[in-house]
Amino acid sequence: MVYYDLNIDSSLPEPKIKSMLSLHTKYGYDSVAITHTVEGKIGYKDVCKIKKIQIEDDSEKSTSSGWMKMGDSNKTIKQYTRLQVICKTMAEFQMITANNPVVQSYDIISVVPYDVSVFNAACNSNEIDIITIDTFSKFIIKPERVRQCIAKGIFIEILYGNLFGIDADRIAFFQIASSLVRSSFGKNIILSSSGKSSTTLRSPYDLSNLGHLFGLTFDQAKAAVSKHPHTAVLHAITRRTKGIATVTDPNLLKDLELWKLERKEDTQPTNNNIPHEKHINKESTGKETIPKPTTTTTTTTTTTTTAKTKTPTPTPTTEKTPSIPTQPPQKPTAKSNKKTTTNTTSTAQKQGKMDIDIDNNKRKRE
């Protein structure tokens, strides 16, 4: 694992920079960037004058694990040059172009936006590699702009050196860091020291634990000091050479090819048309079939009746014969229950009267 710190101030005296580089090697860092900061518009006086510092003592031996041990590895620390421009207006930001010789003289280009318009323009720019969010950036960061920045391959840098300052800087650091993590979901975030004092420098493992305080997972915090800075350096190489470069180190060529493949996978669609398992019905035969949508159709039928008119046909005239009138057949009518009950009661009364009359006649005869 390769660890990076991409922000060491170049305005410090050379002995102090040398002591800081030796401390970086003790903590396990493999690469650093010495930064030249410009406030406002850049000019010819800002052409890169940074020289690589030679460390001759035994402290240049670093560790591969990131712990403070000496003499376990013979790796020498790599040094990159970086231009950091503090932009307050769009006129200052528009000076950063690929045709500018000042920009071409540095390995990495970064911007510190102090205005929301500069930040929005930087998220859609092809001329920079890193956007540094400082505690002086007093504007609201929108998630849409952060995701646009990620799609462009630009990284957002957070300086953890502000934690060791006053309370206001500490509060502003956690507010900015937590909002960036929520907007980017932990992608394309770089953690760097301010590079002004050796007391603010921390090891990569300390930074991995620090990332938990503002929402990063352990892997994301570890990538913020290893994978993401490494990808930013590769992005700077392709930006400077416009995709065509002569690479003498085969390991760097391998990293460039892997980075291009990762970028292609992130930007191109996957063309994955296979549905999820929960959307697939498994029949008894064991085959998987995609359920077809069922549609119900309702049909309505209408019937129309047409009245047929019969034309009268002429009948021959014949002599009339007297005919016997016939009564029309009477249709049987259904009697109700009330009528049947009244009929039965009337017949019973009649039979009772007849019985009384018969008894009276017998008595008279006697």
From Swiss-Prot:
<dbReference type="GO" id="GO:0005655">
    <property type="term" value="C:nucleolar ribonuclease P complex"/>
</dbReference>
<dbReference type="InterPro" id="IPR016195">
    <property type="entry name" value="Pol/histidinol_Pase-like"/>
</dbReference>
<feature type="compositionally biased region" description="Low complexity">
    <location>
        <begin position="291"/>
        <end position="324"/>
    </location>
</feature>
<comment type="function">
    <text>Component of ribonuclease P, a protein complex that generates mature tRNA molecules by cleaving their 5'-ends.</text>
</comment>
<dbReference type="InterPro" id="IPR002738">
    <property type="entry name" value="RNase_P_p30"/>
</dbReference>
<dbReference type="GO" id="GO:0000172">
    <property type="term" value="C:ribonuclease MRP complex"/>
</dbReference>
<dbReference type="GO" id="GO:0000049">
    <property type="term" value="F:tRNA binding"/>
</dbReference>
<comment type="similarity">
    <text>Belongs to the eukaryotic/archaeal RNase P protein component 3 family.</text>
</comment>
<feature type="compositionally biased region" description="Basic and acidic residues">
    <location>
        <begin position="352"/>
        <end position="366"/>
    </location>
</feature>
<dbReference type="GO" id="GO:0033204">
    <property type="term" value="F:ribonuclease P RNA binding"/>
</dbReference>
<dbReference type="GO" id="GO:0004526">
    <property type="term" value="F:ribonuclease P activity"/>
</dbReference>
<dbReference type="GO" id="GO:0003723">
    <property type="term" value="F:RNA binding"/>
</dbReference>
<keyword id="KW-0819">tRNA processing</keyword>
<keyword id="KW-0539">Nucleus</keyword>
<dbReference type="Pfam" id="PF01876">
    <property type="entry name" value="RNase_P_p30"/>
</dbReference>
<dbReference type="GO" id="GO:0008033">
    <property type="term" value="P:tRNA processing"/>
</dbReference>
<feature type="compositionally biased region" description="Low complexity">
    <location>
        <begin position="333"/>
        <end position="351"/>
    </location>
</feature>
<keyword id="KW-0378">Hydrolase</keyword>
<dbReference type="GO" id="GO:0006364">
    <property type="term" value="P:rRNA processing"/>
</dbReference>
<feature type="region of interest" description="Disordered">
    <location>
        <begin position="265"/>
        <end position="366"/>
    </location>
</feature>
<feature type="compositionally biased region" description="Basic and acidic residues">
    <location>
        <begin position="275"/>
        <end position="290"/>
    </location>
</feature>
<protein>
    <recommendedName>
        <fullName>Ribonuclease P protein subunit drpp30</fullName>
        <ecNumber>3.1.26.5</ecNumber>
    </recommendedName>
</protein>
